Amino acid sequence: MRYQASPALVKAPRALLCIHGAGCSPAIFRVQLSKLRAALRENFEFVYVTAPFPSSAGPGILPVFADLGPYYSWFESSSDNNHNGPSVSERLAAVHDPIRRTIVDWQTQHPHIPIVGAIGFSEGALVTTLLLWQQQMGHLPWLPRMSVALLICPWYQDEASQYMRNEVMKNHDDDNDSKDTEWQEELVIRIPTLHLQGRDDFALAGSKMLVARHFSPREAQVLEFAGQHQFPNRPRDVLEVINRFRKLCVTAQTLE
C-alpha cells in the first residue's frame, strides 16, 4: 500500500511520519490530527502509514468514524494460549514492512522533503517508541534520522520492555560489571519527545510507565490534559500542544 500524504499541495520543507493507533486508519488519523496539521502546515508535511493487519475498530473509533474504515492494527491478535505465536522480533518485521515501503515511496517522489520525526497514537506510539529505540541502537538503516517525536496516549506492554532488555543483554553477556549500569542506560531513548497523557485515559498507567522506563527525563516532556484516549480537544490544551511541539522542534533543529 502506498503512502498517504497530506491532501493539500506539498510545499512544507520537512515531513513527519504518522503512525496511527490500533483499529484505526490513515484517514481517521488525519482527522484526529487536524488541528495540529493546520497549525504546522507551513512547516511539515504529514506522511501516513497503514498498519499491516486488518482489524475491528479500536477504542473510541465508533460510531464517529464508522464511514472511515477499513481499520488496521500494528500487531495481529492471537488466540494462542500456548505462547507459540510469533516472537516480538517477528512481529516487528511485519510492522517494519509497510513503514519502510511508505518511506521509500515518499523519498522517491519527494527527495527534497526529508522525514525528520514521527507522530504516534496509542499502539502507534508504542511502535514509534520501538522504532526510535532500534534506530538509536544502530538498527534500521532504512529509517530516516528521527530527531523529534510526538507520542499521543501511548499504549504500553511490558513485553516491549522485555524485548529491549533481551536485545541489550545480548551485547553484555560477558560483561558482568555493566549489567546493572551501562546496559540499563541503553534502554533509554535520547531525542526530544512530547508525551500527551489524557487524565481519564484507560491507558494512562501504561503511558506513564513507558516514558519513565524508556525516555530520558532531560529530553522528554509530558503534558497531561483533560480527556480520555484521544488528541486533546479543548482549545487551550490544543494551543499548549502546538506551542510545546514547536519549541521541541526548534530544540531538535527540525524547525527554525
UniProtKB/Swiss-Prot annotation:
It holds the Pfam family FSH1. It is an enzyme of class 3 (hydrolase). The active site is at residues 122, 201, 229. The keyword Metal-binding does not apply. GO terms for molecular function: polyketide synthase activity; thiolester hydrolase activity. Disruption phenotype: Strongly reduced lovastatin biosynthesis. Low levels of lovastatin are released due to complementation by other esterases. Keywords: Hydrolase. Its EC number is 3.1.2.31. Coiled coil: none annotated. One of its GO terms (cellular component) is cytoplasm. Transmembrane segments: none annotated. GO terms for biological process: lovastatin biosynthetic process. Pathway: Polyketide biosynthesis; lovastatin biosynthesis. The keyword Hydrolase applies. PANTHER family: ESTERASE DBAE-RELATED, ESTERASE OVCA2. Belongs to the LovG family. Esterase; part of the gene cluster that mediates the biosynthesis of lovastatin (also known as mevinolin, mevacor or monacolin K), a hypolipidemic inhibitor of (3S)-hydroxymethylglutaryl-coenzyme A (HMG-CoA) reductase (HMGR). The first step in the biosynthesis of lovastatin is the production of dihydromonacolin L acid by the lovastatin nonaketide synthase lovB and the trans-acting enoyl reductase lovC via condensation of one acetyl-CoA unit and 8 malonyl-CoA units. Dihydromonacolin L acid is released from lovB by the thioesterase lovG. This is Dihydromonacolin L-[lovastatin nonaketide synthase] thioesterase. It comes from Aspergillus terreus.
